[in-house]
Each structure stands twice: as structure tokens, then as C-alpha cells.
Amino acid sequence: LGCSSQLFAQSKYEYGPVSQRQEGVPQGKVTQHRWENSKVFPGTQRDYWIYVPAQYDKSKPASVMIFNDGGGYVRENGHSRAPVVFDNLIAQGKMPVTIGIFINPGVIPAEQAGGKPRRNRSFEYDSLGDLYARFLIEELLPEVEKSYNLTDSAEGRAICGLSSGGICAFTAAWERPDYFTKVVSYIGSFTNIRG
């Protein structure tokens, strides 16, 4: 039994064709940003990235997909390579022009020099209620909309996450079905719910 698990652990994951750069497919642009002005999660700081496909036209509202724990999804060498997948699927006409928003959970800076920052991930992701949905709807998405034309249709909005990010995605859509109709919860940690 131990041997077989070691064999699986040593197997190299191979990306499928849609996760690899394809010749002739236009590449979108990814920009990194920092959010430090949250009223919903005061005192937190977080990085987020915006992916804009090459086919984006400001005169037409784009669909939007939010990724919790976004840093893992946005990296070219990450587990999902989401921008590459988006480039390929949009070019193939298999998904609409979609802006990706990749959000890391908040961090509360150290109070003293040499201290460690406090991660706010469990509070933001594992709590039931509308706080995270409010953070997105009232704070972060309006900031992104200053630069990009995002759809106002719930049918054109999706949210996803892995583990605690998955329960967070589910909870945001549960609390605001008028805002999110598509949810991807990869092995959502429904047992980590704070109560």
C-alpha cells in the first residue's frame, strides 16, 4: 500500500492540450494589483490579478470569473494555468470573452517589527454569511469596473475555489444567487465551516 502511494506521488502531472500555449492563439494580459482599503475586512491587505483576453472590447460587457486563492491559478507554471486555458477556450469559441479576477485571501500585517503577519483566509473563506460576497460586490468588483466593462448579468458571472476557497465560492453564490449563478467548488472544505 505504501509503495503504490509513493508511485502516485512521484508521477508527474501532465497538462492537457487546453492548458498549453497553442500556436496562433492570441494571449491575454495579466496585471497584478494590491487591495488595502477593505471596509468588509478592515486592516487586511491582499494581492489580486486581472486577466484580460486579447479579444476584449470595452464597448461590450465581458463575462467575469473570480478565483479564490488566485495566485495559484494565475501563474503560468501553476496548477491550473487559467490564463492559458482562457486564451485557448476563448479562441476556440468554447467560452465567451471572460475577464478573470484572481484574488488572494487577506493578510493582516504584523503589529511589530519582526513580527509575522496574520492570515485571514479561514475567517474569510470558512465563515458562513455574506461577508465575502459583500467584499466582492461592494469593494473589489467596483474597483475592477473602473477599468473594465463587466457584465451586470448573473448568468455571466462565475466564482471558483479549491478546499476552503471552494466552500467560500459556494457560500458567496448561496448568499447572492442574484449575482453568481456559476460555481466551481474543487474539493470544497465543507467540514471546515466556522460556526
State where each predicted segment sits:
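Non-catalytic cap/lid and distal C-terminal segments of serine-dependent acyl enzymes
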Residues: F8-G195
